[in-house]
Design a protein with these regions (language model features):
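Bacterial Sec-dependent N-terminal signal peptides
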Residues: 1-24
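N-terminal, helix-rich and Lys/Arg-enriched segments in bacterial and organellar proteins
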Residues: 5, 41, 53, 316-317, ...
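A broadly tuned, weak detector of single residues within folded domains
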Residues: 7, 12-14, 45, 107, ...
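Generic detector of short, well-ordered, non-transmembrane alpha-helical segments enriched
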Residues: 17-18, 48, 110, 313
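Short, positively charged
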Residues: 24-29, 292-294
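Active-site nucleophile-adjacent alpha helix/oxyanion-hole segment immediately C-terminal to the catalytic cysteine
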Residues: 27-216, 220-227, 231-255, 340-342
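Active-site signature of cysteine proteases
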Residues: 165-378
């Protein structure tokens, strides 16, 4: 929960014909200069849902379409949610209720849908029922959770897979049946054909993280609740995570970002995320630029081990900025609507990013060659 804070100034956000967000550059004591800004789509709002994983990754894929020379496209977030929920339900029952079941997920869940099914435009699948104006999954999530728990409590799995029809029926009623084909700009597509038309290949994207409890330069299953699919991440030293991030943004790539946003230094209302070295006075939080902590591999690991760093939220890093003192920030696109000073964007300090990153997804080519070699990537 964020307190409502009186903002010093509010600036408009413009979108160019090429989809490049002209991010505003001032709030409170902070004045930002844009260092690098890559082409992205429009700000969206996940509303009353826990589907940031799909919104962030879809935004990332929309940017990939632009980077590859395609036109601006509005892709469906709820298509991924609709495909993924039955997979979560099946896994929950198979693990006898001993793993996460809920609305959360990670970027590799979207990439799995892309690889196995395809992509769908928002115009073909909004996931919003007729007469409803925004996403609200409170009822949907409760119904699905009740269903899978009933399967285990009453041992309905012993009667075959009929219970799966109930899961699909709930999803069809609440967000709509999965489309087998659709029309877009006067042409008929299947989801797989549309994916190929957009030149999106899920195999080109990799998950990266940085923790010391697993060997570096090897894949590992990241132990966070929303990794229900047991997806693998490449583990790299902290300095390599920084190098990958800088190399990606400087060369026109963007980044899907999973992070902890529970710190007091993360303020969507201010549009800034920072990591103060000492706790500021309440009245000085957003009136002074404070010196920041410098994260280390050890401090990152300690925060993760103590659950001080948790997988709270996924967003989309689109560029770089600097404050008036020369500190580096990452321009970050959120999915909570255009409702803060930067119309839905934040400036996240490099220190906050390095300390609070759970994992990222990038295109393989965004990774420096020597790091790719150490990871055994072709």
């Amino acid at each position: 929960m964020f307190k409502k804070i009186k903002l010093a100034a509010i600036f408009a956000l413009g979108i160019s014909a090429h989809g490049i967000a002209q991010t505003p550059v001032s709030t409170g004591p902070y004045t930002f200069s844009i260092v690098k800004e890559n082409a992205v789509g429009s700000i969206e709002n996940q509303c009353q849902t826990g589907t940031c994983w799909s919104f962030a990754t879809v935004s990332f894929l929309e940017a990939e379409v632009l980077r590859k020379g395609g036109k601006s496209i509005d892709l469906s977030e709820m298509y991924n949610v609709r495909i993924t929920y039955p997979l979560k339900a099946d896994a929950y029952v198979r693990y006898q209720g001993k793993q996460q079941f809920g609305p959360g997920g990670l970027s590799h869940d979207v990439l799995r849908v892309v690889a196995e099914h395809g992509l769908v435009p928002q115009s073909a699948y909004s996931g919003i029922k007729s007469g409803v104006t925004e996403h609200n999954h409170g009822g949907l999530d409760a119904l699905l959770e009740s269903t899978v728990k009933t399967v285990l409590d009453k041992k309905l799995n012993e009667e075959g897979g009929a219970w799966k029809n109930s899961v699909n029926g709930i999803l069809d009623a609440e967000i709509g049946p999965v489309p087998s084909s659709f029309e877009f700009n006067g042409k008929k597509f299947t989801p797989a054909q549309f994916r190929d038309e957009l030149k999106i290949n899920a195999a080109e994207y990799v998950s990266i993280s940085s923790f010391t409890h697993h060997p570096y330069y090897a894949p590992f299953v990241l132990e966070v609740p929303d990794n229900w699919a047991k997806g693998s991440f490449y583990n790299v030293p902290l300095q390599d995570l920084e190098r990958i991030t800088e190399n990606a943004l400087d060369n026109g790539y963007t980044i899907a970002w999973d992070a902890d946003v529970s710190e007091k230094g993360f303020s969507y209302l201010q549009g800034v995320a920072v990591l103060p070295a000492s706790m500021p006075k309440k009245e000085e939080w957003w009136t002074i630029i404070h010196p920041e902590l410098t994260p280390t591999a050890a401090s990152r690991q300690d925060a993760f081990d103590r659950f001080e760093t948790t997988d709270d939220h996924l967003m989309h890093i689109t560029g770089k900025s600097k404050d008036q003192l020369g500190n580096t920030y990452y321009i970050t696109k959120n999915s909570w609507g255009a409702t803060n000073p930067f119309k839905g964007y934040l400036h996240v300090s490099k220190n906050y990013y390095l300390m609070k990153t759970i994992g990222i997804v990038v295109h393989k080519d965004a990774i420096p060659t020597e790091i790719r070699t150490k990871l055994g990537m072709k």
